[in-house]
């Protein structure tokens, strides 16, 4: 074995075992989301990451749900889908199936212009991840899961949500269209949120619907 293999697996150890498992990738059209407002929120927020992540495009701050209610609404739809197809079952001492609570960890907006892409990545250590299409056409770049046994490529459609286990590798090829491909993404974690007292800004008396002010521009 090479020195690199020794470093990854441990000196004298064999490579990790290979598993073939099935995981749900849920694709649904949802109604009732305010796509025009979501686009405005993303454009007003602007680029906060500067291409420093796998997504080589405009990418907003991570906590858009704390300042924009419409991001929270999309997350609630993602939760509904995730609850409907748990990755495993948990029982109490009497054998009764328990519902594992999910909470929204983070969510952000993305705008892909022509030629922009997202490199292969995953969202571990979250449990579920999702992406929602605010605007795209059938010729826009798909969401690709390169490690699926059979090629899995999901063409975006406006008002489409895709929910999948966070550890699945995925990517977005270079965007071929002249118009923008506008998305939002988020992560759901299991368990109760640690900071339960932190209310979203839009759920406070101070909120007026404005995207101006120190909280909006906070890093």
Residue ranges of model-derived segments:
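Catalytic core of non-heme Fe(II) oxygenases with the double-stranded beta-helix
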Residues: 100-174, 179-183, 187-202
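A hydrophobic alpha-helix/topogenic segment detector
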Residues: 1, 175-178, 219
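Non-heme Fe(II)/2-oxoglutarate
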Residues: 1-99, 201, 207-212, 216-217
């Amino acid at each position: 074995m090479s020195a690199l293999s020794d470093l990854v697996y441990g000196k004298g150890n064999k490579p990790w075992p290979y598993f073939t498992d099935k995981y749900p990738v849920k694709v649904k059209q949802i109604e009732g989301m305010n796509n025009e407002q979501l686009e405005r929120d993303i454009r007003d927020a602007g680029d906060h990451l500067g291409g420093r992540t796998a997504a080589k495009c405009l990418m907003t701050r991570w906590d858009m749900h704390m300042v924009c209610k419409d991001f929270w609404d999309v997350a609630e739809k993602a939760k509904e889908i995730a609850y409907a197809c748990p990755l495993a079952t948990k029982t109490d001492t009497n054998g009764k199936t328990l519902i594992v609570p999910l909470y929204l960890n983070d969510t952000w907006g993305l705008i892909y212009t022509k030629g922009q892409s997202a490199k292969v990545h995953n969202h571990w250590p979250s449990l579920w991840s999702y992406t929602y299409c605010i605007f795209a056409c059938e010729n826009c770049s798909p969401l690709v899961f390169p490690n699926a046994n059979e090629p899995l490529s999901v063409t975006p459609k406006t008002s489409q949500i895709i929910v999948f286990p966070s550890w699945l590798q995925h990517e977005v090829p270079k965007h071929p269209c002249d118009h923008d491909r506008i998305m939002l993404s988020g992560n759901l974690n299991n368990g109760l949120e640690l900071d339960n007292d932190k209310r979203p800004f839009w759920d406070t008396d101070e909120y007026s619907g404005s995207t101006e002010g120190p909280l909006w521009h906070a890093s």
